[in-house]
Amino acid sequence: MNRDSLLTPNRRGTDSVKWGLYGEDVLALWVADTDFQSPPAVIEALQERVAHGVFGYPLHPQELRELVAARMLERFNWRISPKDMIFIPGVVPGFNLTCQLLTKPGESVLVQPPVYPPILNAAEKTGARNIHVELVRQTDGSYAVDFDALEAAIEEDTRCLIFCNPHNPVGKVYSRQELERLVEICLRHKLTIISDEIHSDLIFKGSQHIPIASLSDEVSKSTVTLIAPSKTFNIAGLSCAVLICTNHELLKKIENTSHGLLGDVNLLGLTAAIAAYRDGSGWLEHMMEVLEGNRDFTFDFIEKRLPQIKMHSPDATYLAWLDCRELALEESPYKFFLKKAKVALNCGDDFGDCGKGFVRLNFGCSRELLTEALEKMEKAIRER
């Protein structure tokens, strides 16, 4: 299997958000889906299901429950039961709904920017309010939690922390020591943890993902974990995610509330998830090799040819968080690179105030496309 065997030749004209939002002359390295074709096992399973020709209301397969439980044990040494989960259309609806159930209007939710924009928006959708406790950028470009600031920010009406691990956009994988300290604070203040772990399959060598709920039975019962095969196997459009909670009283409350609000999981999403989790491990291993090569290529290119941009090599995800503040641009780097380089990135402002002057780059694409985009960015900087 060579690098190019993963790639979709052309996504333009396929109603892709990533490739359809901007003009034909713009290279899309923004929204977090890859340009890689899904695993052959997934495509074959979908073709077989479509050939059946009937697409009525689906049951939630026991096979998928068992596959998820086995996957959590095998990959993360986290023992859960098939009864500890429900299937929902997406991670974002999952944390929005959970936040709604845990808070009343005016109560507060902890978030840690720079972070995935829907996490910043979750509280406002329910009438609650955010308390921002920014991650601290270190001299090497990595990020750390200021635990003293986090605890000091907790108010009497703070109900939960929306946590992101692996972290989007900075690519941080939290250590056991960091997780244990975070958990200690949350348990002491009786905060529920809503943990977005959608990127947990996309871990590079040298790092290890630890589900925060796996630390103890006590924290498990105070945590709602959200995962999905969508980022891993590039099936976001099929709308299937997993919400895990060993507190069955809370899980049942979430499930009951979801009916009529979230809608059901897509039938083909269930089919794809089963095939991906059952038969996609070899494909995933190869994709991670490709992503690691792209990550290292991006880092080396920026270090050598774009020295005014700073990048810390991520521990996980296919996303690079680029500090462009030294460029001293008159406009946001997002607008600059879109107009001058014809490269679409994510605007750092969307990830919180501390994201101003940053962009997020998606390197889940062909090496050729990645090279072309970086060279266009280099040319735009040189000619400004």
Where are these regions (language model features)?
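N-terminal small-domain helix-loop-helix segment of the aminotransferase-like
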Residues: 1-90, 97, 278, 384
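PLP-dependent enzyme catalytic core of the Aspartate aminotransferase-like
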Residues: 336-345, 351-384
